[in-house]
Amino acid sequence: MRHHCSWPPFFLLITTFTTGQDFRTYDQKIDPAVSFKMVTIPAGKFLIGSKSIMADSDEAPLREIELSPFWMSEHEVTFEEWDLYFNDMSLPQSKTIDGITRATPQYIDLTWGMGRDGKHPVNSMSQQAAMMYCKWLYIKTGFFYRLPTEAEWEYACKAGGNMVTPEALKAYGYFKENADGKFHHVKEKKPNAWGLYDMLGNLREWTIDQYDPAYYSTVKNNDPITTPGPRYPRTARGGSYLDPVTELRCSNRIPSDPKWNQRDPQIPKSRWWLTDGMFVGFRVVRPVKQHSREKIEKFYDLYLK
């Protein structure tokens, strides 16, 4: 059953940020004591893909893609932020992902003892659960938050084209060789050139796109986004604390797999949580262009069905 929430009174007063003066990094407050930073990602063109000898076949061909400006959260969503949504008693808990609901409780600790304080990144959620959090943010703030597209994520990771060598990556992220078998607090490592933390390593990050091995060959050149299909595979990016440093590339694409939820004993398996996906989290983006309420709601309906 759909749950209808009242819209914030300032919703109709929201204006579109269009000028250089307005397009700046800001702090999004979601509670008197909780906020997160949204970093400006400028419009531009870049080469999507990789010509590295370590690249997989789905990282080719190199293509020039043009993107509109957007904001991206400077770090992965943390438990401090997620728990405001998860504990929002105005929302019903439901096994189905419909309307606006909050995630059902985990039947076991899906951090597997790695840590759950406010600065740890939230982990083990499905892509749809991450999108529901984005919808909750929209209802709470009036701003259109969503998961990044693959192209947006890769563009932000490359940050103007300055690639980090595997040897230098230990200063920027946690991976198999330096993570001690667990994920860590956000922002413990250096940010990339655009001020984004943990883009490579710590947790893999959901994008909004359906995984297509031919993505780089088939997507359009401007602001590409794929239409959702089956639950599997969807695309994650960035690598995690479990991945070797050689897998931490901005162009590396990670298709989700039913094995990420293999040990879930529930019938049917949870649509919110991934018992074996302890390595995946997410961060949010906000397009500069604020669409109408009707278009935004249709967007959420499409990607949450």
Q: Predicted regions span which residues?
A:
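Positively charged n-region of N-terminal signal peptides that target proteins for export
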Residues: 1-5
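Mature N-terminal segment immediately following signal peptide/propeptide cleavage
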Residues: 34-47
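Surface-exposed recognition segments
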Residues: 54-65, 180-182, 203-305
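Short, well-ordered junction/capping motifs at the entry into regular secondary structure
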Residues: 171-200, 228-230
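Structural recognition of the beta-strand scaffold that forms the well-ordered cores
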Residues: 39-40, 123-124, 146-148, 164, ...
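Active-site microenvironments of metalloenzymes and redox enzymes
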Residues: 48-54, 66-168, 209-216, 286-305
